[in-house]
Every structure is written in structure tokens, then in C-alpha cells.
UniProtKB/Swiss-Prot annotation:
NCBIfam families named among the record's database cross-references: rpsS_bact (TIGR01050)
Molecular function via GO: rRNA binding; structural constituent of ribosome
Gene3D superfamilies recorded: 30s Ribosomal Protein S19, Chain A
Name of the protein in question: Small ribosomal subunit protein uS19
Gene that this polypeptide is encoded by: rpsS
Pfam families with a match to the protein in the record: Ribosomal_S19
Family: Belongs to the universal ribosomal protein uS19 family.
Single GO BP term: translation
GO CC annotations on file: cytoplasm; small ribosomal subunit
Organism of provenance: Paracidovorax citrulli (strain AAC00-1)
PROSITE patterns assigned: RIBOSOMAL_S19
Length: 92
């Protein structure tokens, strides 16, 4: 179910403050955040946001196509290493 339009997008206040400061100072360093639940706003375009995936911060460059999505969608939390090889086949 999508979020109601009358509520508006959710962005953590501390993240919004960091982004506004980075835009005002034209800082190119990644903005480090743990807030995967925050929505990408148009003010974020052109910034690099380091989103925490549970282990490390993954740098995500924000483009106009990402607006409206959540930051957590761009920092994967699980790594798939493939299914284990079948033991019966290796007996040859």
C-alpha cells in the first residue's frame, strides 16, 4: 500500500538538515546516513548519500529518476553467493 498523498513524503529531520547544509556549502563529500526509510526528495539531486546497509555505508549518487523512492532501495543488504554445488555430481 502506498503512502497517502495528504501526508506527504517522509524524511528524517537530521538527514534533511545534513542535506541542506551540504547544498548551502556546496560540499562534495558523501552525506552519511543510517536512515534507509527516508524518501528521496528533489533537493537531493546531484548529491552523494552514503546509505548504511547493516555493515558499511554504500555511496549512492542521487539522480532525478530516484525521486520518490526510499534510500534503502539503493543499498542492498543481502549478498547472494550462489547455491552450493551438488555433492552427488562431483563423485565422477
Amino acid at each position: 500500500m502506498t503512502r497517502s498523498l495528504k501526508k506527504g513524503p517522509f524524511v528524517d529531520h537530521h538527514l534533511l538538515a545534513k542535506v541542506e547544509k551540504a547544498v548551502a556549502t556546496k560540499d562534495k563529500k558523501p552525506v552519511k546516513t543510517w536512515s534507509r526509510r527516508s524518501m528521496v526528495l528533489p533537493e537531493f539531486i546531484g548529491l552523494t548519500i552514503a546509505v548504511h546497509n547493516g555493515k558499511q555505508h554504500v555511496p549512492v549518487y542521487i539522480t532525478d529518476q530516484m525521486v520518490g523512492h526510499k534510500l534503502g532501495e539503493f543499498a542492498l543488504t543481502r549478498t547472494f553467493k550462489g547455491h552450493p554445488a551438488d555433492k552427488k555430481v562431483q563423485k565422477k
